[in-house]
Amino acid sequence: MTNLEVDYAIIGAGPTGLYGAYYAGFRGWSTAVIDALPEVGGQITAMYPEKDIFDVAGFPAVRGRVLVEQLKEQADQFSPNYVLGEQASELTAPEGGPVTLTTAQGSTITAKALLITGGIGSFRPRPLPAGSDWEDKGLAFFVPKPDHYANKEVVIVGGGDSALDWAHMLHPIAKRISIVHRRDQFRAHAAMVTQAREMGIDLLTPYEVTALRGEEHLAEVEITSKTDGAVTLLPAQEVIAALGFIANIGPIADWGLDLDKRHIRVNTSMQTNLPGVFAAGDIAVYEGKVPLISIAFGEAALAVNNAAPIINPELGVFPGHSSGESN
């Protein structure tokens, strides 16, 4: 159980939260970063540590875990207080402050301002209906260790970015990669689909996985055509279900924030309807929002700098350039 008083508190230790911690530290503020997960990195650490990310400025490609390591190193210059493995459960944000957070584990964090970077909230993968008895016997929902798939026949189920990203990542080491999608059109970026075809990855559409078969471990996947009902058997030792996630923002829904479904509405300063409370990253929504990690970094900087007059009325929003002095 932890009791902290800081200038700036951040919910979420994913990339957006870590960059927010860096920027708050750059402005000379004490910070606390709270996350329900036991490690920093958010969804990237939990689900995609070996996935390459292509839309971070300055990096043609960067492995997820490497990006998280560098963001943490950047933030740690200013010694943020990490409160990990604890879920923020209650918030009070009176006019004039301070903001007080209480975690489900009994910790209390008091801050002059708060940034919520909770991503999509808590999440669990959408199940593969035909695979309910096959977890740990060949069915997986994430790819934390690509080498596990070396020299194996792999079926990836889904048509989004994750399905194509994993196919591209595993293609050099797997014996064979097949993607099964229940629609003719993929949701993934068209260039990734084209590249998959050119690489020789089998794209099987419109098909649905109707059964997994094997003895102690998966041996084959039954797929059924949605066009004519024809059944095909694919030899496979591994199946990766990339069907998206069921998300829940949890206690945040009860804090009196102006919500749009699972997202928090913010203004152009990234401020919410509650005094001293800001939001950035996937959880924040505004007109024209584009949910990209590169944009989330800018949102975090906006949120931090617009909190400056709350932290100290003598401070301006603009911090000065990073090549000069902070504050």
Predicted regions located by residue number:
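Residue-level detector of alpha-helix initiation sites
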Residues: 14-16, 39, 122, 161-162, ...
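Conserved N-terminal glycine-rich FAD pyrophosphate-binding loop of Rossmann-like flavoproteins
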Residues: 38-62, 189-197
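Rossmann-like NAD(P)H-binding beta-loop-alpha module
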Residues: 38, 150-173
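A Rossmann-like FAD-binding core segment of flavoenzymes
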Residues: 72-103, 108-111, 171-268, 311, ...
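FAD-site-proximal beta/loop scaffold in flavoenzymes
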Residues: 127, 132-150, 235-294, 302-309
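N-terminal Rossmann-like FAD-binding beta1-loop-alpha1 element of flavoenzymes
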Residues: 6-33, 166-171
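Glycine-rich FAD pyrophosphate-binding loop
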Residues: 11, 25-47, 176-188
